[in-house]
Amino acid sequence: MYYHNQHQGKSILSSSRMPISSERHPFLRGNGTGDSGLILSTDAKPRLKWTPDLHERFVEAVNQLGGGDKATPKTIMKVMGIPGLTLYHLKSHLQKYRLSKNLNGQANSSLNKTSVMTMVEENPPEVDESHSESLSIGPQPSMNLPISDALQMQIEVQRRLHEQLEVQRHLQLRIEAQGKYLQSILEKAQETLGRQNLGAAGIEATKAQLSELVSKVSADYPDSSFLEPKELQNLHHQQMQKTYPPNSSLDSCLTSSEGTQKAPKMLDNRLGLRTYIGDSTSEQKEIMEEPFFHRMELTWAEEESLRENHNRPYLSTMVNNAEPRISSSRRSPGRLSIGVGLHEHRGRSSNNSEYTEERFNENNEDCKLETHTRTALDLNTHDENYGTTRPKQFDLNGFSWN
């Protein structure tokens, strides 16, 4: 029973739905008569297809009601008077119409465009134009960049990159050239250093040879020219003390002067004699060969100056009409100048000097020597036993010895 009733109910529902499905054809017109010209879909919420005629009637109704802002779906439905139109259909279409009105009267057909443009020109055209102008002007700076400028900028960037690459290449070439130049300089410096080392070795060899020559010369000629001044003075003092004692007389001096003719070099080395020859070249040779005697004369002159400063008695006896002593360069070749310095004890009197002068005058005539050279004899005797010394000088000029 219950099953029969349920099945019967289902049949009733199906029977009740059948006429609706038969009536709702995909596009049915109005109440089935087709007078209204409506085309509806078969969805749960049937959609209306707005044809140009239907839209034209909708626009007329909206215009009668005073425009899209004042018109409502209910008033539009009453004015149109088309059966089958619902508020849902009119409401959606009115919204679209208002949007199209706000977007400068866009319409679905060419007929609607004229009516929409007339409605838009009445109230909002200035606002829309200003807004459109602002919209058109706003994006122009960002969108209207010329393509030529962009290409020019790209070309400029590429050119700068190319220039930078060229500069880097030139720098690399210059760095390589500089490195090669420095390498060549280093090689040349090494070569010069090697040559300098060879030169230094040669210099050392020459120094060794010179030292050997000096040692040989000093061994062969142990003369005073290789000695120091102090050693020369000491040697001079020792030689003078050995040759002439402090109490030696003028006879010993004269005999020693005679011996100089026999052995001049020995006496020159021991007594400090210098033979002056008239020829200047020979005189220069003698001076260059015997520097020791020049130093002896200098030391003798210094001793004489010191004695004068200490105000000690100085006796000078001039012989042969008291002729003054002249320099050896002005004397004739046949004259002899002998300077004798006798150092005596402080306790001795001046009788010794007078006695020496008398003996010299007596022996003056016997001692005659014929010489063609000028001889300067400087004899200084130093006695270490005496506390003080009294220098005496005898200058003899104008004697020719036979």
Swiss-Prot record:
Expressed in phloem and/or cambium. The keyword Cytoplasm does not apply. The keyword Transcription regulation applies. Pfam families: Myb_CC_LHEQLE (PF14379), Myb_DNA-binding (PF00249). Residues 42-102 form the HTH myb-type domain. It is found in: Nucleus. InterPro entries: Homeodomain-like_sf, Myb_CC_LHEQLE, Myb_dom, Myb_dom_plants, PHR1-like, SANT/Myb. Residues 238-266, 344-363, 382-402 are annotated as: Disordered. This is Myb-related protein 1. Residues 148-168 form a coiled coil. GO terms for molecular function: DNA binding; DNA-binding transcription factor activity. Residues 73-98 bind DNA. Residues 238-260 have a biased composition (Polar residues). One of its GO terms (cellular component) is nucleus. A motif (LHEQLE) lies at residues 161-166. Belongs to the MYB-CC family. Isoforms 1 and 2: homodimer. Isoform 3: loss of dimerization. Keywords: Coiled coil, DNA-binding, Nucleus, Transcription, Transcription regulation. Disruption phenotype: No visible phenotype when grown under long days conditions, but early flowering when grown under short days conditions. Transcription factor that may act on the GAL1 promoter. Acts redundantly with MYR2 as a repressor of flowering and organ elongation under decreased light intensity. Represses gibberellic acid (GA)-dependent responses and affects levels of bioactive GA.
